[in-house]
């Protein structure tokens, strides 16, 4: 009887602790790790100096730029995979065991995010008379150089990196559901705009990018596996790249 009573108390205590963790606004350790990895993400382009110096590359053509980006992104993904290897292995099991349910949730949230993204882009383009986002123009230019390498780089590798940096890191840093979704989507949207903006009005493009980022965050929150958002992010990017190739 004492054993059963103790077991019930342990379960009750565990339930309370888990509930408290979910209600926490921030995780200091998670924030510190997130800041370090965000800086690594932001400075990862410097990894391109390795092949530039190693092969004594004098001229950076469009094709060379794509290959250098592929190199730095691959190295960055390997580093992130090593850092989060335990969590990634655990979440892969969750994703695999409930694949159909996770995929169904992912599709639903992606469609919602896509609709909001398309509507906001339409308003920005036709109502506010704004052109295409500078980031989109830059990506399409890179696709024109080495299209199928871009399928690998922007369609497969980049989504893995971005989901780990903008979703996994933020979920670890901000246990509160809505704080995680709002902050991760805002930063995700900002990073796709600020790095290539040409005027202050370009900041409005944070809305379409951020809405898609919010859908990725919500599907991760719902399924508890980063692979759901990685898969949907891959599908989204790959479709856009292929459409750009055949257009």
Task: Say what each PLM segment does.
Residues 57-64, 89-158:
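Juxtamembrane helix-loop-helix connectors linking adjacent transmembrane helices
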Residues 46-57, 124-128, 193-197:
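Juxtamembrane "helix-exit" motif on the non-cytosolic side of transmembrane helices
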Residues 2-4, 11-25:
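Short, Lys/Arg-rich, polar N-terminal cytosolic tail immediately upstream
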Residues 81-91, 219-223:
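Structural signal for the C-terminal ends of transmembrane alpha-helices
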Residues 29-87, 135-137:
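Alpha-helical transmembrane segments in multi-pass membrane proteins
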